[in-house]
């Protein structure tokens, strides 16, 4: 499954996870991506969209 929003381009970000004793390990932060049916150029199409774009109304859902 794609880990990138097709509307805003938000994708995976890499960082560091710290334990209580401050030991470090690398980890990734993935966006909350949903596969929704949306209107794209007048036709319904399945797209990968982050929940921020869904909540803000940047995507017109197809029924």
From Swiss-Prot:
Keywords: Ribonucleoprotein, Ribosomal protein. GO terms for biological process: translation. One of its GO terms (cellular component) is ribonucleoprotein complex. InterPro entries: Bacterial_rp_bL28 (IPR050096), Ribosomal_bL28 (IPR026569), Ribosomal_bL28/bL31-like_sf (IPR034704), Ribosomal_bL28_bact-type (IPR001383), Ribosomal_bL28_sf (IPR037147). Transmembrane segments: none annotated. It comes from the Bacteria. One of its GO terms (molecular function) is structural constituent of ribosome. Pfam families: Ribosomal_L28 (PF00830). PANTHER family: 50S RIBOSOMAL PROTEIN L28, LARGE RIBOSOMAL SUBUNIT PROTEIN BL28A. Belongs to the bacterial ribosomal protein bL28 family. This is Large ribosomal subunit protein bL28. The gene is rpmB.
């Amino acid at each position: 499954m794609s880990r990138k929003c097709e509307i805003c381009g938000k994708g995976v970000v890499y960082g560091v996870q710290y334990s209580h004793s401050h030991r470090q390990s690398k980890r990734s932060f993935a966006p909350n991506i949903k596969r929704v049916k949306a209107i794209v150029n007048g036709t319904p199409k399945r797209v990968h969209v982050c929940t921020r774009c869904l909540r803000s109304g940047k995507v017109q859902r197809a029924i």
